Amino acid sequence: MRRAVILVLDRAGPV
């Protein structure tokens, strides 16, 4: 699974 990608996208998503 790609949790790192999800974390990065979720972190740089709303911002």
Curated annotation (Swiss-Prot):
This is leu operon leader peptide. Involved in control of the biosynthesis of leucine. One of its GO terms (biological process) is L-leucine biosynthetic process. Keywords: Amino-acid biosynthesis, Branched-chain amino acid biosynthesis, Leader peptide, Leucine biosynthesis.
